[in-house]
Amino acid sequence: MDKRILLTLALGAMSQVFTHAWEPKGDKIKTVWAEQVTPENVWQSYPRPQLQRAEWINLNGLWKYAVTDQNTSRKNVSFEGEILVPFAIESSLSGVQKTFLPTDKLWYQREFSLDPSWKNKSAILHFGAVDYECQVWVNNRLVGTHKGGNNPFSFDITKYLKKSGPQSIEVAVTDPTDTESISRGKQQLNQEGIWYTPVSGIWQTVWLEAVNKTYIRQVLPSTDIERKSVKLAFDIAGAKGNEEVKIEVLDDGKVIKTVEQKLTNAMEIDVPNAVLWSPESPKLYHLNIVLSNGGRVLDRVKSYFALRKVDVRKDECGYNRICLNNQPIFQYGPLDQGWWPDGLLTPPSEEAMLWDMVQLKKMGFNMIRKHIKVEPEQYYYYADSLGLMM
């Protein structure tokens, strides 16, 4: 047989082995979205709607993993297989579905490459959530640690990167679950009654973004419905004190207001023909923000806001009432645990998460009582877009 044909067949066989290596584990009930999940398409959308940048790398997908006792050192770790990030090791969609004990340590490892356009820029490594305590290494150097299973965190890994070639990330995780007094929701090692399967390790998106030395770390909008304005508070990393900012306010994709001025800690912008947000009319305004210095662009981000006001007022009988835009509002919604049979705390996909919310809206609910869980940041953007109070 032609050697080229043999080589093609061999490569094809290798490709099939790699493609079919991952699959959901276990025979427990799964959602219809489970069969659509692949290592190539898992949670690929930009993970932070409130502050979006163009240059980023999604690190979800297959990572090497190992489970050891907590006394095992990094140099003695032998990886035993692959795990699909961002699903917890106990979940079916991780491809592992193993019980993880408080005496265990979970190790992750993967490689990535940087685009040449990232040269002379800083690289920020983001974790949406890791349950519960973790250490992170880049190219065999400890970058930092984090404790807490629900909140996002990040590290500037620029100084740990090699000038070229593949870069390596390793993560080590421990999780006491219910053996310590920590924020764990309904996780319990012995599932019974109202208690659920534990969630250990990476369970939200891991990603990298490129920024300049001076960049927008955070933009926080707060609105005033009486003044029909939005105030933007900025947190700027590496600010020199002479930066300028250009802000465009967009309504349905059309620029309705442009402001250019020297950057200050907080800026108030009037919104022309302002429309208030409500569950019946969930109006969102979008922002294009450009940070510059002497004509040189330092950063470009997108964000959004809604004109609304939530407070508590006395009614005619003297009872406290929650009000939206100065009017009492009856909140009608379910207690939502946010657990999935196949992904546990992690929805199998963004489509699955959105479908759930759309159905609640169709049922006539105007709010969701999210129960002992912090969702991925996309969840709250969809709530704003659909008209669901949280």
Identify the role of each PLM range:
Residues 63, 140, 206, 285, ...:
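Conserved, mostly hydrophobic/aromatic
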Residues 137, 147-160, 178-189, 193-196, ...:
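Active-site mouth of glycoside hydrolases
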Residues 1-23:
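Bacterial Sec-dependent N-terminal signal peptides
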Residues 22-56:
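N-terminal pre-domain segments of enzymes
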Residues 138, 228-261, 287:
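Beta-strand-rich binding/interaction modules
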Residues 64-68, 98-99, 103-215, 239, ...:
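Accessory beta-strand-rich segments of carbohydrate-active enzymes
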